[in-house]
Amino acid sequence: MTYAIVETSGKQLWVEPGRFYDVDRLPGTEENSPLALSQVLLINHEGQVTLGHPYVPEAVVRARVLQHRRGNKIIVYKMRPKKGTRKKRGHRQPLTRVLIESIELNGTTLATAQSAPPSTSEATTDTTGIPAAEE
């Protein structure tokens, strides 16, 4: 299992290839554009840990911007008892959804996103649940 811990938008995020993550809005990025995250704090590749001080040199996590979206609405309600003061406000955080494509260290690709799970050629099971009649 290969994963990396990267720093983006002032937060640390554990990322694995082939998964998507919602991070704070990344200004200046467009949908379906490539993105290189170079602030890598740690890389674990099959049990071998590479730790940075604070960042791992020549380590890059390649990602692709899937979409810009907004998070779930958070309701903030302030009330002062016995005063009749009430305030109700909502907030939706702007987010960017990124797909992690690969983790690279010193120019070599350690892990990439799996395009599709391996299919079994012996998938001849009957999905109806009715046993076949014997002749």
Swiss-Prot record:
Alphabetized GO MF terms: rRNA binding; structural constituent of ribosome
PROSITE patterns per the UniProt record, alphabetical: RIBOSOMAL_L21
An individual GO BP term: translation
InterPro entries noted in UniProt: bL21-like, bL21-like_sf, Ribosomal_bL21, Ribosomal_bL21_CS
NCBIfam families the UniProt entry points to: L21
HAMAP family: Ribosomal_bL21 (MF_01363)
Protein name: Large ribosomal subunit protein bL21
Name of encoding gene: rplU
